[in-house]
Amino acid sequence: MTTPNIITRKIAPVLPAEYTEILDRVRYQWATCLVLTLDRPLSDMYWLSIADDLPFVACVEHTNFMKPEEYGGNHIVYLSNYASSGNPVLEMDARQVLEHYTPGLKVINPDFDPSWVRNAWFFKDPGGQPVIGTNYSRSIPPFATGIAGLYLANTTQVYPEDRGQNYSLQLGEEVARLIHADVRAVAARKGAWI
């Protein structure tokens, strides 16, 4: 499984108690993403990581990487952020989030006007980012869940690194090696060759 711990608990409710105790130690920030289709470019940048005091942490203008013609002439912009439970943004719809983000969009492009927006969608995920606290290493679940043949590889396990595609690939390779070793061990016990 590659799901956040909170989803893993819902999908596999019969996990051993010791394992679920480890899963439950991790707290998450929500990931949010406002996706906009614009009738014109917002900027000439593909990816902006935002460290300023704006209401989002990344602005990815996908159509500065792929041609707008591949998206019906639309300019696709992703605005992502993290939010703690209880953040008012989590209760907003796409139009409300757009209104909240508009001052930040005007920092990127002072000419930006909400009339440029053809459509907007707002997505949120409660398992967006593990919160790394003191003694976090005690909260990292092992890959083997305690249920034969069921393994977990998710962002809680990339510590001390930060989550990212490269680390996800490394986790996948580690778990694949573990599964291969486990399958070989089971086969050996049964007298089979692998």
Identify what each model region corresponds to.
Residues 1-91, 95, 103-108, 141, ...:
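Mid-domain catalytic core of redox enzymes
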Residues 9-13, 132, 162-163:
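Short glycine-/acidic-enriched loop or helix-start segments at secondary-structure transitions
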Residues 28-31, 109-125:
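A short coil-to-beta-strand element that immediately follows conserved catalytic motifs
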Residues 66-72, 124-159:
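FAD-binding beta-loop-beta segment adjacent to the flavin cofactor pocket
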Residues 94-97, 168:
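Hydrophobic (often cysteine-bearing) scaffold residues that line and stabilize catalytic clefts
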Residues 101-104, 175:
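Alpha-helical packing segments of well-folded alpha/beta enzyme cores
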Residues 107-117, 181-189:
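Surface-exposed helix-capping loop/turn segments at secondary-structure junctions
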Residues 154-183:
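A conserved FAD-binding loop/helix module that cradles the flavin
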